[in-house]
């Protein structure tokens, strides 16, 4: 692609000399064209000494003069600090998504929630360098960003840094050019293109330095007057031949002209799709503001008014739609100006129309009011009078509105003097407020003037305001520039025409225009703009009919498209929110399944975009049919977390979801499909999507029927997939064959960290395969293997794996028919394993003999924190052995001994251990008949123990005397937070003892006294005691023979005495 950069001395010398300007330009063009010395017929014109150095010549006086010229052109600008630090690096992207190619910028920001895929970044100073040792520098680079993201700011910043020698040091020549400049020419040759950037190149005293490598910057492709057509453009290699500007640019990008020059193009995403992907070597994207950068941006706008800043930040954070749009820097500044004017306009809460904006149109109405008030004009100018404000608003809309409107229709965003004259714009009005707040003026290199709206959305707002006013008196179709059409009378007729045009525009270019047009009919906007732009109360005649018209646009199509969702945005702007609210209430109540009409589907898709709850997790469980899901597919792409449990989905639905997960636009990170009817065919469809998906990190398929074949398909995908970190196949009957397939995947996969294989009929052979994989795998952190049948053989195999595995942190072997032999093997491994933190052996067949092995391991192991031995056969002998280990162990924090036939003797041993142990924070002894003696032993420990925070003594045969000593312990204990005494028999006496403790205890947060025969008297004691305890957060007094009336009285008393405490009666 690229020729040698080191040329001969004669060739390298072609950048110096004192030849004529024409000869200098010719030499420069030859070098840019890659012809070297042979391409120039007048080398003597740029001759230099043979021993002159090669390379960029950054210290050459002529280069310095060029850098100075660039600095005068780009001027000052933001330094890389505060919110502008984001320009120090760009996101590397792999081509454009369908959303970027087809939808409006606002839709892109809303759908992606202000952020794209997690992507690699490239530093600005490495933007044009190879990404690896084996790659080459990119010739054609494109940087994309929605309108107002800072593309031109980035270019100017890069040019400024290059002129100071801080970036692009291997470029001897940087030629920045904007499409606004190019639009002033009908035809150009390559020679004239360069001269337009370098007017000083023709001066006899200045020659061009050696272009060891040159960079041509083309800023703002979306502003190009004529779309680029790479299919029908004739190739041109003659730099002197004048051709249409779009043909010239096309040939430069193709490499027919300037093949040795690096090309950097900036563009909005949709416009960049004109360039074939095969011609683009590198694509980057400017990221938007994050929350901190939004704050810094607003701080820089209002550095001296902290009250205003605090209020403004609270408004932005409270409105999700406003926050998302503020990730776009230009919109963030516009929002700051509008909210700042609102703040300064408020005189008190009686100003109903001065409350913060709830819609886009309200926000822009405040900006419009700011412009009319003269707040945005230069200091020193007098503010306009009230009558001037009203006249100025209508005159500005009349002056610029038609231009803005027809510019939208033609996708024209830059205007020149001839455009202004064609639409009757008085140029004299553009210099002051309010036009200066909407339109910016820029001189081009061709000595002409270009105008553009300060942000695309302002053009759309002014266009909507123009259309709103014109449609009230127009008799022909306003969308026809010539004005010749079938008669159209009445505002509603013209609104219907606008809605139809917007629905038919596949690229969404009229979406925001229609939102603004709808918003101008809302009561709040009418109150804001009455007198200056709108007539007081005129919206009332049309608002209801417009709402019906918009809802009529929601047809029962196969899929809910972006246009349909925009209708819901329009209804929101109109402040007609009944449809969206009904669907939101149905989602919250679980009644979504009965709302299946096209309007409800569109509203659901809209909520998936804008709802705060859906932003956290879109819960569509128990609510969707295949048809409804199919219609929502385009919108599900952008849900971060998606729950589709218990929807009776079968394999065909998985084909649909697979297509979503395979999409380049897919943003889904977590998806749950639990308790559906998915078989191996559906699992295979999902597996195919995992081969290409790069966003999904968690997949939950529990409670389906994928079987061994489905597990194999998913396992094969895991050998390639590098993003999935959590996979649940619980209850899928994958058996040993499925476990073997998963084990094979784990041998090579290095990203999966959680694998759930509970209830899958896996036996010893499957466990052996998984153990073999664990000997090699270092990434898996959690393995859930409960409710299988691995037996002692499987346990021994896993034990061998634990001796060498240094990654697994949690292992669940509940209900696996493991006896003492298997436990002994596992405990032998624990003596040396240094990574396992949690082990569950509940519901197995561990006897006192196995408990001895456990005790030995606890004495040797220094990493295990959680051990669950619930529902085994430890008895007192086994519990005593473990108690001895607890005395010595310094790392175990949670110990579950529920339902192990433990009695008072073992409880006494555990109590003695707790007096010495300083690490155990949770002890579960429920459903063990430890009685009052056991409770006394535990109570003695609580008086001195400072580590235990949770104690579970449900159904432990504890009576009043046991409660008495526990109460005495609670009176002095300062660490216990949870005490569960459910299902005992402490009675009124026990309640009184605990009540006395509650009066002085300051640590307990949850107390469960359910089913303890407290009676009314005992409950009253507890309720009364809480008047002095304001730290208890939850108490359960159910099942204590209090009666309904007593329960209400006790509940009210507790709420009175402890308002923050939740009561269960």
Curated annotation (Swiss-Prot):
Keywords: ATP-binding, Cytoplasm, Leucine-rich repeat, Nucleotide-binding, Repeat
Annotated stretches, region: Disordered: 1-62
Gene3D superfamilies from the UniProt entry: P-loop containing nucleotide triphosphate hydrolases (3.40.50.300), Ribonuclease Inhibitor (3.80.10.10)
PROSITE patterns: NACHT
Any GO BP annotation: negative regulation of NF-kappaB transcription factor activity
Entry keyword NADP: no
Short motif (TRAF6-binding): ranges: 457-460
Induction: In primary T-cells, down-regulated upon T-cell receptor activation. Down-regulated in peritoneal macrophages soon after the beginning of LPS stimulation. Levels start increasing again after 3 days of LPS treatment.
NACHT domain ranges (all copies): 139-460
Molecular function via GO: ATP binding; phosphatidylinositol 3-kinase regulatory subunit binding
Compartments where found: Cytoplasm
Highest taxon, organism lineage: Eukaryota
Matches recorded under InterPro entries: Leu-rich_rpt, LRR_dom_sf, NACHT_NTPase, NLR, NLRP_HD2, NOD1/2_WH, P-loop_NTPase
Residue sites binding ATP per the record: 145-152
Repeat region (LRR), residues: 617-639, 641-663, 665-688, 693-716, 721-744, 749-772, 777-800, 805-828, 833-856, 861-884, 889-912, 917-940, 945-968, 973-996, 1001-1029, 1031-1052
UniProt biased composition (Basic and acidic residues): 1-10
GO (cellular component) term, any one: cytosol
Pfam families named in the record: LRR_6, NACHT, NLRC4_HD2, NOD2_WH
Assigned protein family: Belongs to the NLRP family.
Quaternary organization: Directly interacts (via CARD) with TMEM173/STING; this interaction reduces TMEM173 trafficking to the perinuclear region in response to interferon stimulatory DNA. Also interacts, but to a lesser extent, with TBK1. Interacts with TRAF6; this interaction results in decreased TRAF6 'Lys-63'-linked polyubiquitination, but leaves 'Lys-48'-linked chains unchanged, promoting TRAF6 protein degradation. Interacts with PIK3R1/PIK3R2; this interaction disrupts the association between PIK3R1/PIK3R2 and the p110 catalytic subunit PIK3CA/PIK3CB/PIK3CD and reduces PIK3R1/PIK3R2 activation.
Function: Negative regulator of the innate immune response. Attenuates signaling pathways activated by Toll-like receptors (TLRs) and the DNA sensor STING/TMEM173 in response to pathogen-associated molecular patterns, such as intracellular poly(dA:dT), but not poly(I:C), or in response to DNA virus infection, including that of Herpes simplex virus 1 (HSV1). May affect TLR4 signaling by acting at the level of TRAF6 ubiquitination, decreasing the activating 'Lys-63'-linked ubiquitination and leaving unchanged the degradative 'Lys-48'-linked ubiquitination.
Domain notes: The leucine-rich repeat domain may reduce the interaction with TMEM173/STING.
UniProt protein name: NLR family CARD domain-containing protein 3
Gene (name only): NLRC3
